Each structure stands twice: as C-alpha cells, then as structure tokens.
Regions:
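N-terminal targeting sequences that direct proteins away from the cytosol to non-cytosolic compartments
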Residues: 1-72, 169-201
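Extended hydrophobic/Leu-rich segments
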Residues: 28, 98-101, 124
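Short small/polar-residue motifs
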Residues: 29-31, 58-64, 76-77, 115-122, ...
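Short, exposed beta-strand/loop patches in secreted or surface proteins that constitute
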Residues: 36, 46, 70-71, 80-81, ...
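Secretory pathway targeting signatures of secreted, lumenal, and periplasmic proteins
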Residues: 44-106
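A contiguous binding-surface segment within folded domains or other stable secondary-structure elements
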Residues: 101-120
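Short Gly/Thr-rich strand-loop-strand
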Residues: 115-137
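Short, well-structured beta-strand
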Residues: 129-201
Length: 201
C-alpha cells in the first residue's frame, strides 16, 4: 500500500523527506522539481512552470528567483547555476522557452544579435523523436559560452546561453581542461530537454 508520499510533489513534502542537496533544500528551486527519484546519478527531473518541457537538473544547482513564466504559457525564462560560488569552475544557464515559433532562421538571427557575433551552429543528434538541437561556442580568456537552439515539429523551442567560467585563481591551462569536462555535462543537460504537449506528455 502507498503511504501517500509518492503522490506528493517535492514542494509539498516534509523537508526531512527531501534529498539533502541544493536542488531540494532551496525553497524556490524545489518548486520546479518533479520527483525525488534520480533520473541518473546526480540529476533529478525538473518540469518547467509552463509545463512546456522537462530536463535533467543537476542536484548541486539552484534556480535564480528572477526566472519566470508568462500566464499564457507561451514564454518562460529559467536561470540556474551552482549554489556554491567558491569553486574552480562555475556554470550559469539562461534558458528561454518560446511557443509557438516556427521560423528557426529568425531564432538563429535573434541569437546572433544577443551574442553580438555570427554564431557557427552545428547539429547534434537529438535524444527525443521529432526534436532537433544545434549548438555553437563562444570563447574568451576566462569564459566558454555554449549556445543551444532546441526545437521540435510542434513549434516549441528553447534558446539557451550557458557560461562556463573559471575562478580567478585558476591558470589558463587548468581552466581549459576544467571547461572541457564541464562542456560534456552541459551538453548532456541540453540533450535531456524534452518538450511536452498540451497534455503534459
């Protein structure tokens, strides 16, 4: 028999029953968490406020409270980063969800303007059927920015800018090595984004 806990969302559960990680101990972030069951080691399922998409959320990150969703569910911004700022390499994700948007070239042009340069998008193999993903990179002395455009056949899309930054104490070579490792984690999060239809599936 069920004890009732399985039917509760993390935001409704007793804090003592939640995983002892930033994603659930932060009051704002846990509102986005779909379940206390890991989707893979170190990652939990997040569902957006628009119910437009899910993703695998890193357990040691928190969502910025400037994130918001429009009441009509056509737009959402989702911003998250590591809770601990005193680490060697830090990520900040800025995700914009839009629906409906059918003109992908318009989206790329808009992202070029945001980046302040012409982005060289490259296709990646998508995990989910009828979804598409292209990414580009911007590199400067201390920051690697990964840019992703993800969309599907139902005119849903996310535009993502993720900065991977090294702390000032890290030298150039070590920074590049750390950013390479972090790049793989970031791309895995990109690929985990799954669009939902109006029935939440």
């Amino acid at each position: 028999m069920s004890n009732g806990k399985e039917s509760l969302s993390p935001s409704e559960m007793d804090p003592k029953d939640l995983p002892d990680v930033p994603a659930f101990q932060d009051e704002y972030t846990k509102e986005y968490m779909q379940s206390t069951e890991q989707v893979k080691d170190g990652y939990y399922p997040l569902i957006s406020k628009t119910n437009g998409f899910t993703l695998h959320f890193p357990e040691d990150m928190v969502i910025d409270d400037t994130s918001n969703a429009q009441p009509d569910n056509h737009y959402e911004s989702l911003i998250f980063h590591y809770e601990n700022n005193d680490i060697a390499v830090m990520d900040e994700y800025i995700i914009h969800y839009l629906s409906p948007v059918s003109d992908i070239e318009w989206s790329k042009d808009y992202m070029n303007r945001r980046a302040g340069e012409e982005l060289n998008f490259k296709k990646l193999e998508a995990v989910y059927e009828n979804q598409y993903i292209e990414i580009a990179e911007i590199k400067d002395e201390s920051t690697l920015t990964l840019v992703a455009l993800i969309w599907n056949d139902n005119d849903q899309q996310t535009q993502i800018f993720t900065d991977i930054m090294c702390s000032k104490e890290i030298d150039k070579d070590e920074c590049a090595s750390l950013q390479d490792k972090e790049r793989e984690k970031v791309i895995d999060v990109f690929k985990s984004i799954k669009f939902l239809d109006d029935k939440g599936k």
